[in-house]
Regions:
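Multi-bladed beta-propeller domains
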Residues: 7-26, 31, 41-42, 52-71, ...
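Short beta-strand elements that form the blades of beta-propeller/WD-repeat-like
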Residues: 83, 269-273, 302-313
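Cleft-lining beta-strand/loop regions that shape enzyme active-site pockets
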Residues: 357, 446-453, 467, 472-666, ...
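Residue-level detector of Asp-centered blade-edge/turn motifs that repeat once per structural unit
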Residues: 32-33, 77-78, 119-120, 163-164, ...
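Hydrophobic beta-strand positions that form the internal "hydrophobic ladder"
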Residues: 37, 79-82, 121-124, 168, ...
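Extended, small/polar residue-biased N-terminal targeting/export presequences
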Residues: 380-435, 502-528, 715-716, 720-737
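Structural motif
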Residues: 3-5, 46-50, 90-92, 133-137, ...
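PDZ/PDZ-like domain segments forming the peptide/carboxylate-binding groove
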Residues: 417-476, 550, 673
Length: 738
C-alpha cells in the first residue's frame, strides 16, 4: 500500500518506516552490511532511489531528477553501490557514497530487467535484449569490459553467479520437442527451457565430468597470501574469468524441461523455482528435491525466507523440504490512509506512467504538462475512488488513443446474487402458470453452452408450461425468476406439463445457469450457419470469430476445419473484442495449394498443404471489430483474400503489454506499441479503422427483428464470386506407365 515496514523475525515491534499516504514507497532492500535500507519512492514527485539509515532513520535521495519509471534495484554484496533498471532501457550503477551514476548497459529493444551480482561485487551479469534472441552478458567492473556468454542462437533468462563466483547458472530454451496438432499437420514448441551451468574459471570443477576411482597422490598446494587473507577475513575469493571458447563450456542440468526462474547455486546444490515452489538439484547425488516452499535468499546466502501461501519464516539455507511452522507475524502490518493524499499520489503516478510508457515521445502533440495541470485542480474535490478513476480517464483521454484505460483500485463491490437461469423465455399464462415461449438452442455436451430445459431426461419443449419450482406453485407468482434467486448451479425441481394444469404434470430436475451469454452466442452462430447454408444450397461455410484470444481461436478451429470442403467461406469479424491471434488465422486463410495428393483407392485428391481453403472468401466487419479485430481485416485486405463488407472498424491498434499497479491495486493501461505500414509510409488504422470494400450499416430496427442486412449482402456477394472464382480439387490424372 505504498509504505515500507520492518518486521521482527521472531518477536518484537513492527515499524512503519515511511508512513505516508502521499507517496508510493516500494522495492525495499536491506544493504548486505545491514546499515541501510534502499527503496524506490516518488515522495519528491518522481521515482528515485532513497537510502534510509537503519539505525538513525535519517534519509537521503540517492538519485536525482530521473523522470523515469524504476523497475528494480539490487545492492552490491559489498554494500557500496546499487544496480538498477528503468523504463529508458538502461542498466545503471550508482555509488552509495556520492550518488555518482554510470550507465552499465542500454538497449534499443526493451528494458534490462534481469541482472545479478557476483559475491565479490566485481562482476555483473544481465540479459541484453535482442530483437530475435536475448544474450547473457558479464560486465567486469575492474576492466570496464563486457563479455557475451551466449551465441544468440537460443533465448536465455535468469542468469546468476554461484556463491563462489566460479559458475554462471541460467535458463535457456534449447529443448526441441515439438507437439503436433490434432487439427492439421502442424506443430508447436512448448516447455523448451532447462537450466544450464557455465564454468567461468579455469579451476572450476566440471559438473557431470567422467570420473575415475583410482587413487592419486595428494597434491600439496601452499596457501597464497590471497588465500590466507580470504580465510582470515571471510572475503570472497577473487575470481579471474576465462572467456575463451566460453559458449562450448555450457552444461545442461538433467531436469525436465519447464518454466524455470530465480536460480541460485551454493556448492553442489542448484536452487530453482518452478510452478511456485523452490527445488534443489544436487550435482553430486544427481537428485532433485522439492523444498515444498518458495525460498528467497538473503545477502551472502547466510539466511533465507521460506514462503508457503501467505506465511513467511526466516530459516537457514535449506537442503531438504521446508515446513513453515513458525511464520513471521504480519498482524501489525497496518496503516492509516488519508484517501485524499493517496488519490493525489495515484493521479500523479498515472500521469507519469503515461508519460514514461506511451509509445509516441511527442505525446501525440499534446501539451502533457498542461494536461496534468488542467485535471489536477479536480483531485481535491474527489470523494470516491470511482470519481478518481473518471478524472484519470478524462486526463488520458486527451491523447486520443485506443487502449488507454483507467481501472478502479479499492472501491466498494456489492455482492451479486447468483440468479438461476433456464436458457428460455417465458410468458405469464391466463392460467397463472408460465408458458415456455422460446428455448435457446444449446450444445449440451459442453457445460458452457448447455440448455437446461433440453438436457436428457428433462426435455421440456416450447409451448410447455412451468407449474411449480421446488414444489411451490407459480400460479400466484408474478415473476418466475423470483423463485430462482440464488439457485444458479444448484439442483432445482420443476413441475412441468404440456397443458396449464396439474393433471398429468411431471417433475424434472434441472441445474440452472448463472450466465446465458454463451448459450445465446452459440444459438446466434448456429442460426447464421443455417441461414448461409440454406441460402447457398450448402455450398458456403460461415465462421464467426468473437475475439482474437483463446475463445476466438477455438471458434475458428471448431468451424474452419469441418468446412474445408465448402466451395466458399463467409468469415464474420463483427463484434471481435481483440487479442493477438489474427496472424495465426490469417496465415491459414492465405494458404494456396502447392499440389494435391492421392492415396490408393481414393476417388479425389487432397490439398497440400493441409488446411488450405480453396474457394473465395468474404469478411464481415463493423464498428465493434476492435484492436486485433481491426488488424485482422487489415491483413485480409493487404493479402487480397477477398471482399470486406460492413461498417468501418473501431480503429484502436496502439497496444499495451501488461499494467503496473498503483498503491491501491488500481491501474492504468498505457499504449506502448503501434503498427506502421509495411512500406514505412506511416502508422496505420489508429483513430480511423479499416474501411470495408462495401459500406453497409445494419438498420437497428430490422436487426432487432432478426434481419441481418450485412450477412444478407455477404451471401449475395459470395454467390456472385462463386460464378467466377470457384476452385475445386482437380481430377486425379492418368497413372504413369513406366
Amino acid at each position: 500500500r505504498g509504505d515500507i515496514f520492518t518486521l521482527p523475525a521472531k518477536s518484537g515491534i513492527t515499524y512503519n518506516l515511511t508512513n505516508s499516504s502521499n507517496a508510493n514507497d516500494r522495492n525495499p532492500q536491506w544493504s548486505p552490511d545491514g546499515k541501510w535500507i534502499a527503496y524506490i519512492s516518488d515522495k519528491n514527485g518522481e521515482f528515485n532511489i532513497w537510502l534510509r539509515d537503519a539505525f538513525t532513520g535519517e534519509e537521503k535521495m540517492l538519485t536525482k531528477d530521473l523522470k523515469t519509471y524504476i523497475f528494480d534495484l539490487k545492492w552490491a554484496p559489498d554494500s557500496r553501490s546499487i544496480l538498477w533498471s528503468e523504463k529508458k532501457n538502461t542498466l545503471n550503477l550508482t555509488q552509495v557514497s556520492d550518488g555518482k551514476t554510470e550507465v552499465i548497459a542500454s538497449s534499443g529493444v526493451g528494458p534490462i530487467n534481469s541482472f545479478n551480482w557476483s559475491q565479490d561485487s566485481r562482476y555483473i551479469t544481465y540479459i541484453q535484449p535482442g530483437k530475435e534472441m536475448d544474450n547473457i552478458i558479464i560486465y567486469d567492473r575492474n576492466s570496464k569490459e563486457k563479455h557475451q556468454m551466449t551465441d544468440g542462437w537460443y533465448n536465455v533468462s535468469s542468469p546468476n553467479f554461484s556463491k563462489d563466483g566460479k559458475y554462471l547458472v541460467f535458463v535457456s530454451a534449447r529443448t526441441f520437442n515439438p507437439t503436433y496438432s490434432s487439427t492439421e499437420w502442424n506443430h508447436v514448441y512448448n516447455n523448451m527451457n532447462k537450466i544450464y551451468i557455465l564454468p567461468l574459471t579455469q579451476d572450476a570443477t566440471i559438473p557431470f565430468a567422467p570420473e575415475n576411482d583410482n587413487p592419486k597422490a595428494p597434491q600439496q598446494t601452499p596457501p597464497t597470501r590471497e588465500t590466507k587473507k580470504s580465510e582470515a577475513t571471510k572475503e570472497h575469493p577473487k575470481n579471474e574469468y576465462d572467456y575463451t571458447n566460453i559458449a562450448n563450456r555450457i552444461i545442461e542440468l538433467p531436469v525436465s524441461a519447464g518454466n524455470y526462474h530465480d536460480l541460485h547455486m551454493i556448492g553442489n546444490q542448484v536452487y530453482f523455482n518452478r510452478y511456485g515452489n523452490t527445488s534443489i538439484y544436487n550435482l553430486k547425488d544427481r537428485k532433485e528435491t522439492d523444498l515444498n516452499s518458495r525460498i528467497m535468499f538473503g545477502p551472502g546466502y547466510e539466511k533465507a525466507i521460506a514462503q508457503s501461501g501467505r506465511a513467511f519464516q526466516v530459516i537457514d539455507i535449506p537442503s531438504a523440504p521446508v515446513s513453515v511452522n513458525h511464520p513471521i507475524s504480519t498482524s501489525d502490518l497496518k496503516k492509516y490512509i488519508d484517501y485524499h493524499q493517496e488519490w493525489m499520489q495515484i493521479y500523479n503516478e498515472s500521469w507519469r506512467q503515461m508519460r514514461d510508457f506511451f509509445y509516441a515521445k511527442n505525446m501525440h502533440g499534446v501539451d502533457w504538462q498542461g494536461v496534468y495541470e488542467k485535471y489536477k485542480v479536480l483531485i481535491p474535490h474527489v470523494n470516491h475512488r470511482t470519481d478518481l478513476t473518471y478524472v484519470i480517464g478524462e486526463m488520458i483521454g486527451e491523447l486520443s488513443v485506443g487502449h488507454a484505460y483507467s481501472a478502479n483500485g479499492e472501491h466498494p463491490t456489492p455482492a451479486r446474487i447468483p440468479m438461476g437461469l433456464l436458457g428460455a423465455r417465458f410468458k405469464k399464462d391466463p392460467s397463472g402458470y408460465f408458458k415456455v415461449t422460446k428455448i435457446i438452442e444449446g450444445a449440451n455436451w459442453n457445460e458452457a453452452t448447455r440448455s437446461p430445459l433440453t438436457m436428457p431426461g428433462v426435455e421440456v419443449k416450447e409451448g410447455h408450461y412451468i407449474l411449480a419450482i421446488n414444489g411451490k406453485s407459480l400460479k400466484e407468482t408474478e415473476n418466475l425468476f423470483s423463485e430462482l434467486i440464488g439457485k444458479a448451479g444448484k439442483t432445482v425441481e420443476l413441475t412441468v406439463n404440456t397443458r396449464p394444469e396439474t393433471a398429468g404434470a411431471r417433475q424434472v430436475l434441472v441445474t440452472p445457469l448463472s450466465d446465458e451469454s454463451q448459450l445465446y452466442y452459440y444459438n446466434w452462430v448456429q442460426n447464421n450457419i443455417r441461414k448461409v447454408s440454406e441460402a447457398t444450397n450448402g455450398e458456403v461455410g460461415y465462421i464467426h470469430i468473437p475475439d482474437m484470444g483463446v475463445d476466438g481461436l477455438n471458434e475458428f478451429v471448431k468451424h474452419y476445419y469441418p468446412q474445408l470442403g465448402k466451395k466458399a467461406l463467409i468469415i464474420d469479424d463483427r463484434g471481435n473484442g481483440g487479442g493477438n491471434v489474427s496472424p495465426m488465422i490469417t496465415e491459414r486463410l492465405m494458404r494456396t495449394p502447392h499440389f494435391y495428393t492421392m492415396h490408393t483407392n481414393q476417388t479425389s485428391g487432397s490439398v497440400s498443404p493441409v488446411g488450405t481453403f480453396l474457394g473465395p472468401k468474404v469478411l464481415l466487419v463493423n464498428e465493434y471489430s476492435a484492436s486485433d479485430g481491426d488488424l485482422f481485416p487489415y491483413r485480409f485486405k493487404f493479402n487480397k483474400l477477398g471482399t470486406v463488407i460492413g461498417h468501418r472498424t473501431w480503429g484502436g491498434v496502439v497496444g499495451y503489454s501488461g499494467t503496473i499497479p498503483v498503491v491501491d491495486g488500481g491501474s492504468i493501461v498505457t499504449p506502448s506499441y503501434a503498427p506502421f505500414a509495411a512500406d514505412g509510409s506511416g502508422f496505420i488504422i489508429e483513430g480511423h479503422g479499416v474501411d470495408p470494400d462495401i459500406l453497409l450499416e445494419n438498420d437497428p430496427y430490422l436487426e432487432f427483428n432478426g434481419e441481418d442486412q450485412q450477412l444478407n449482402k455477404a451471401i449475395e456477394v459470395i454467390l456472385e464470386k462463386l460464378k467466377t472464382e470457384k476452385k475445386e480439387v482437380p481430377a486425379i490424372p492418368e497413372f504413369p506407365v513406366k
